[in-house]
């Protein structure tokens, strides 16, 4: 499905931060058939992954030590206003709002359960231009041990509704925006290693 815009409050982009960018680009291009387009030295090695000339994800050098991590971006009308909303709702601002050339404006946050995510205020780059097809983003899912905190936070910041989904399991929640399903939440039980923090997972 081709996309030309995203409604505010909708997950719209993902990127991978990795300590081995060359290895990651080789792996994902072989797995998904991505064409990797280096954005130039001014972008610090950041690359766009494309299918048929349409951007579907980003890959860049990790900005923090540790294992590779995928970041989910949520479209907003104003990244600066999102900073205030996140603070008010009890989240933590990891990176204040800043411009990405003429592509858009972003900020990075941690929710009260410890999951990191970003917001995206689009200008020339709307986010993923192709979704719900092989090799592209199909789903974003919050994985957390504190679902009640997460429900309160995301409903306040983005206006999401949290709806239990018994068909997907007793601990599964669908996030909806204006009655449209835009993501999910699963509760981490004791089967999850204790060292794994709350995080946003991405599905292709």
Q: For the regions a protein language model found, what residue spans apply to each?
A:
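Intrinsically disordered, low-complexity proline/glycine-rich segments
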Residues: 57, 183-185
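Glycine-rich acetyl-CoA-binding "A-motif" of GNAT/NAT acetyltransferases
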Residues: 55, 68, 116
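Core segments of cupin and vicinal oxygen chelate
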Residues: 6-54, 88, 96-104, 108, ...
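Short acidic, gly/pro-rich beta-turn/loop elements at beta-sheet edges
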Residues: 24-26, 59, 82-84, 150, ...
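Vicinal oxygen chelate
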Residues: 1-7, 10-19, 48-50, 62-85, 87-138, 163-180, ...
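Active-site-flanking structural segment that lines cofactor/substrate pockets
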Residues: 55-61
